[in-house]
Structures are given as C-alpha cells and as structure tokens.
Amino acid sequence: EFYNEFYVLDLILDRSEGEPKAAGVVAYELATGEIHVFTAKSVIFASGGFGKVFKTTSNAHTLTGDGMAIVYRKGLPLEDMEFYQFHPTGLAGLGVLLTEGARGEGGILRNVDGERFMERYAPTIKDLAPRDMVSRAMLQEVREGRGAGPHKDYVYLDLTHLPAAQIEEKLPDITEFARTYLGVDPVSELVPVFPTAHYAMGGIPTNIETEVLRNNTDVVPGLYAAGECACVSVHGSNRLGTNSLLDINVFGRRAGIAAAEYASTAEQPPLPEDAAGHVVSLVENL
C-alpha cells in the first residue's frame, strides 16, 4: 500500500541494545495535519537533494534536504556536503536547465561585450569544457564586470549563428523554454544564462550495498539510502553528466533488494514510548 501526500519528518531508531537500529518513521499527513507512526524492519531514504537551499536551482520545490537533515538530527554523519555541482546553462534567475547539447551543437557563451570568453579559460575545448570550468568562468565574467543585463548578473548563450532548422530540430526544449519563460527566441536572440545549483554529490554515507554508515566501518541495521540523498562516493567531487541516472538505477535496485532481504529475517525492533513526541513539538512550533 502506498501512502501519498505523507511527509516523513523523523526516523525512529531503536537503541535498546546500545547501537542504533532502524525501527520506523514518523510522518505528517498533508491533507489532515495528522501525525502517523509507521513501524518498519527496514527503512530506505530516497528523498533527493537539497538544491532549494540555493537562491537559483534546477531542483523541485520539495528538495530541501529533509532526508539528510533527519538523519543528521539522529546523530548520524553526513559526508561530502561541500561537493555541490552547478550546471552552467540555467535560464538566468530561474534555474531552468538548458541542455549542454546546445554547446555541443555549436552554441557559444558570450559576455556583455560579445566576446567568446571561454577561449580565455579553456583555449582548446572552449565552450565544451566541463561543467565546473564553465560555471567558474561565467561567474568570473560577472564578478569582473562583464556580465549582461540591467544588473550585469548573467552572460549569454548564442545560437543565432546556427541554422534555424537545426535549432528547432536538435534543441526543441531550449527554444520552448527560452520563449516560454523569458520571451526570447534563440533563433534570433541571445539567451540569458547563469549557473544554477543542480546536484549534490554528498549526503547520507552508505556502502555499496546502500547500508547507511554510522562511522567509517559500522552500519545502522535496517537503514538504507539511495539516490541523491545518499553518498556512496561514486561521483567524487564532480559528477559527470547523466551518471546520476546510472547511480539511481544501480543503487536504487540494490537498496530495494537489501532492505527486503533484511526485513524477511529481522525482528521488528521495539518503539520508544513516545515515538512521535519530537515531531508533534516540531510541528506545533512551526
């Protein structure tokens, strides 16, 4: 059974035998405001990243890092939280992503003077440089006063030298987004862009079986994490494009299998006397 519109606010850990063990979660029912306690032999966190802590992000409004925060409040560690990736070509001020395919098709980044500035930062690969290099270069242009717009806080993506048919056929999303959100036609106009917060490499530390680690070697029995909220350290400090899809497929599957296998043999841990007490206080103080 699926419980839609339930928002998990706390993790229940059993510490009756000393070391923590997953025992369930406490959730807030959005439709009624009721607090519910769910017992569980195994728990998987797949709560996504925390892009909404930044002013401009490609992330959904719900991605505020709550899963990571819940784990941290239970005294468990987080890992590599400083490793956050910015996608270079987000629509300025909005964060809506414009695919890197635009530069792959021949799109050029220009500053307010019309200069193809990536020639200075990456003379060989220019606009096809990795995300971190391009993002830093764009920020540097703005910091040094070569940004465009009323506040000089973005640069331009130039596709106007490409055939209109190529843009419409190969980059339909870009044309739609730019026209819809900015009223700009990429076929004939420069598109305002600036780096947008995109992906967290850090998060809840796990091993390759997605078991959550409470230190470098010991796991929390029954607790698993996968996806962007987890840090299994496969991306290092700078994820390569599309590797997040590979990550969630591989480790999402592993988490499901591992959690099911654990639950099939484990006993249900006892719940603390007032399992929902902290959450009730938290909600009442909002």
Range-by-range predicted roles:
Residues 37-48, 71, 114, 223-225:
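Short hydrophobic core segments
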Residues 1-39, 167:
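Feature captures the FAD/FMN-dependent oxidoreductase FAD-binding
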Residues 177-221:
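FAD/FMN-dependent oxidoreductases across multiple families
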Residues 31, 35, 51-62, 93-104, ...:
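Alpha-helix capping and helix-loop boundary segments enriched in small/acidic/polar residues
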Residues 14-15, 110-119, 123-128, 138, ...:
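Glycine- and aromatic-enriched mobile tails/lids
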Residues 70, 76-192, 258-264:
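An anion/pyrophosphate-binding glycine-rich loop and adjacent beta-alpha core
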Residues 42-96, 149, 241-258:
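Glycine-rich loop(s) and the adjacent beta-strand/alpha-helix scaffold that form part
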